[in-house]
């Protein structure tokens, strides 16, 4: 383990290999300061939403941040998505969009997934609060063969999209820099940028909720980040599920 003083002003822990950067922060949250960042050169058991797993490769960047008792816990997936988009554009110049809720899309390919997990904690005075771990997995330097052999036909890396290799720690620095800036920004500004970047809007989409599939038109993003849809029965709001 290497301990660095900070990354964009946040405490940083770097590892050669970890099962999961999110899991490490959950297990060690009590002994780590707020906004501690963890990265690993290789994440062997990474995970995404609804239990999806990540394929292990040193060409992917896993980066997670611990946020202790945030006031805006429900906003953090939206904030992370915008932060990653900004970081990708700073690093590579590629325009980045968001597939609701948490997939980052470049050139119609997924390049990053986001998983924000909360854990309930008790303070010394008995108060209950949430810690949130914001985890991001960015495809940085994988080649086309990796995605072909893995059967990931809708995924790409910054390398496959540009032909350039990138410094993973520089990518992490940009992500953390944008994330720390956006956490403290007015959320209405963030949600406006999220809406502008959302590639789901204006399309007919399939919604999968509780093992039930429906079709609807993705109309707008609500002020809280939910997806506003419309079908023959009228307008409705989706707060979770697959799109």
Q: Model-found features: residue ranges?
A:
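N-terminal lobe of the biotin/lipoate ligase/transferase fold
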Residues: 1-90, 94, 112, 123, ...
